[in-house]
Amino acid sequence: MNKLRDKFVDSTVEEERLRENRNHEKYWYRWGPYLSERSWATVREDYSLNGDAWSNFPFEHANARVFRWGEDGLFGVSDNKQLVCMNVALWNGKDERLKERLFGLTGPQGNHGEDVKELYFYLDNTPTHSYMKALYKYPFKKAFPYKELVQKNGERGYEDKEFEVYDIDGLYRDSETGDNPYFDVFFEMAKDDENPSELNFRLTIHNRSKIDSGELYIAPQLFFRNTWAFDGTRTKDKPLLERDAEAANLINMTHKKYGNCQMVFQPSPGGFSSGTNEEEEDKEVEDIDPLLLFTDNESNLVKLFNEEKNPSEYTKDAFEEYLVQGKTDAVNPENKGTKACAVYHFKNIPPGEYVTVRYKFTNDPKNSIFKAQNLAVVDEDEFDLIFDNREEEADNFYWRITPLPISDELRNLQRQAFSGLLWTKQFYNFTYDAWYNGDANVKPRPPPNRANGRNKNWKHLYIEDILSMPDKWEYPFFASWDTAFHCIPLAMIDPEFAKRQLDLLTREWYMHPNGQIPAYEWNFNDVNPPVHAWAVYRVFKIERNMYNREDRTFLERVFQKLLLNFTWWVNRKDTEGKNVFEGGFLGLDNIGVFNRSEPLPTGGTLEQADSTGWMAFFSLQMLNIALELAKENPVYEDIASKFFEHFILISDSMSFEYATDITGEKCKEVIKQNLWNEADKFYYDAISWGDHKVQLPIRSLVGLIPLYASMTLEPSIIKQFRGFKKRVDWFVNNRPEIFDRNIASMSKKGVGERLLLSLVTKERLTAILSRLLDETEFLSPYGIRSLSKYHEKHPFEMNVNGVEYMVKYLPGESDSGMFGGNSNWRGPIWFPTSFLIMEALQRFYLYYGSDFKVECPVGSGDYLNLAEVAEELGYRMIHLFVPDENGERAIHYGDHSKFLSSDPYFRDYVPFFEYFDGDTGRGLGASHQCGWTALVAKWISDVGISCVRLPRTPRSSVATTASTESSEQGPKMKRMARRKSAKSLVNYTATILDLTEEEKRHHRIGGTHSGLTPQSSISSDKARHLMEEMNEEEGIHETVVPEDRHNFETKLIGKLKDKVKNMKVTDKAKDEDIDPMDPMSPLNKDVS
């Protein structure tokens, strides 16, 4: 029974860490990849008068100037308040500077805005950061081309492709020899089995070329974020690093919060000599002992600003001065300070060889660090075993997240998407008062009304949290609508962290007192789409379905704050009180003909189809949550009725507008079309001058967003909430003209007797889909274009006061500097908006069923129901990343980057771009947008099992990160590989939308059954394992595929009870009412 009990109640080691963290038993979140990848040229570090953040703190200052608000670094790790920091520095003996942070162009330097110019990849990470792995590619044959990258990109215009590092011949690839003259620098961190504050680090550096590398300096760093210069504690309680008196490779750390800790740098085994004869080639080089260097994390004001004196004799740039400039007096000879490093000097790494560097940070050195012969040492076998164990535990964890027979390529893609999502966590620190007024101990004081008064209405902001970033180099700041999408894949692997992100943005030190959610640091006042309520409810449902937990406290707490946010929208963005909204920016940058964040050059007001569609969507999400909360608290039933009414009024106003008579009263007899264009069968924005308006006939995402606002009302919900039903019936009976005009099927029952709330009728839905699924309009081979390809030959043009405005289809980069020029919504494919369209189609399918089919693609003669259409769109977007029949990934489209798909040292590493070319799928924008582009991980779980053009049976249960070699390792590989999945589209749809079991039963069509769904819940997975185990003991050898969860659980409980009858139970267990299915019951402790 113990064996069976363990099978049922067991969890992966990583899940157990998450449980310990959730229950405050151990703080596994304490240490993680929380350093930014760019703190220079950010708004927070800008103390200029004119608000020019790009120039006020340039890259050239970063090595010698202290950051006020947060540190950055290569492979950066810190505690959750970023008091103690670690990163890696490299020098190839040729570069003009130490490589301790990633380089890129500022907004003005790039021909398409800011752009990181390095090659690096996130390969692995777990939610507790018990194991992390990343790769940086560092050239050694040539010096890193800092100046050339700036110059070449500066010579290019908006119409040109960007100049990339791999465009430089001989840097990463030699065109003549095919050689790869660079180092692969693999970084790994593994936490101790029991101690969350014992961190083990391992660097493995490969020479990928056919030539000797020459020298390489590796310098792992340990330092404190400089807080003492700003809070008046320059001498009081100042932390200290100093070399140990007995061990030359050991650093002792003293810190007010963390006490006494140590960091030991193990001698490296070295490489091999590249001698000229056989005997010399086989001769092993002696170990490389690290050299410890110390300085202070203080600005070099003398060097940067010609000041007379520095705050400290030893400054932040000391290690670069020492190694690159040869200034041996730059470091502290007393071997102490607030910044330290360990220098490993390798004179050469021969072709194809590698070297390894190991080091450890711990708050409990007595159990893991030993001193011998003037050195501190660690057990290297035990050290490497920790990494083996953590990596195996990560494999087990991710196999449990997606235990499906999907291809190795998809498993690798999903693993890297999750890893990137976790790597892009960052400590975000911002206090408005200190930022705007300056620090008391820092001179000169900031100029009055500096930065043009940026964010002056956000004086309440006080942020010091670990947040999910869109991209830690290009966007090292939170963006509220990005965060909502990040939380969907995050909830699959760490629902607690996902909930924390959504909760934080509504807390009083983030949300404005008027209810507005801050947008992003360049302008917290900008208006992002209202997707927060949707994300909150989706995360709630994902946790319920995957982990069998319902956090109603979270749902209710955030819902209360979202009531404020909804009120802010209604009061501030519906200026004429007509339920038609002029939202402004709404995250879609340049999608309109005018800058939507600024007043119209035409005068009047821009009534936005997407803004009004977003508000209808917001209303339905709030209705969803209110009905969920009303299941246990009837107070919320009244609130649900209120949001139902909001949706009804918004939906009516979006398509129709009453005229008014001379007194200003509505003339019920006269109705004008509003944002829907009956001739074009599409939604358009309109400019309103009060008494008349003009539509702007641009076919863009703006006209597709109304599809988002859809929701099915289940018969059980209508029956359960009588007050809500009464309100619905009143509208149906007393306002029939609204429903007859544009509320889809409120008086007609769909499949399963359910009702549909939607902005679009069946006729309008069909019309919109005829454009959406047309490959000459929105449908790309790789997803959904943001602007119809129709506008390639038919641009929209408008002349206002002699100025020409035009919107033309641009599948690639932007052709202007609008919004920085680094994004484009006039043709490319974007993940967040596509994700919501696909979910909307799934919801429509639940109402209309399999009989409602549309041609997909238009002109193909193939007719699909809406669930199949959603799957087809998912397949297309997944195939942005996976190799085609020629082994090439669409994201690497173009001759200059094809080698990224074919080179054995590149082809398995997947960059997650911000957006994608609408025609070719080429990756564009930020190259590590592992925020919303990580949504691909959810699609893989949803539809990966049936994804075409890929092998469906995995060769391994291990999600490889560097190879697709076959492997026999992994948990229950045979059992997992032989599992079957249900074929019913209802099951796919119910799983994708994270419906409850009750809702799934309501949605079954034609007697279909639930079966094994693509996104198996972890709790259901355990139950099936247990049933299979017991079947095998009884001689039954078959895969368990439960036809009905209730019947399945009944059978399982029966089998367990039969087992219990044959076992000896202690008296204590006999005297209590024991549920054998309860893992916490006394039975599970007392049965022998």
UniProtKB/Swiss-Prot annotation:
Residues 954-980, 1063-1088 are annotated as: Disordered. It comes from the Eukaryota. One of its GO terms (molecular function) is Glc3Man9GlcNAc2 oligosaccharide glucosidase activity. The modification Phosphothreonine is found at T1013. InterPro entries: 6-hairpin_glycosidase_sf, 6hp_glycosidase-like_sf, Glycoside_hydrolase_63, MGH1-like_GH. The modification Phosphoserine is found at S299, S984, S1081. Keywords: Phosphoprotein. One of its GO terms (cellular component) is cytoplasm. It holds the Pfam family MGH1-like_GH. Residues 956-968 have a biased composition (Low complexity). GO terms for biological process: oligosaccharide metabolic process. Present with 2220 molecules/cell in log phase SD medium. This is Uncharacterized protein YMR196W. It comes from Saccharomyces cerevisiae (strain ATCC 204508 / S288c).
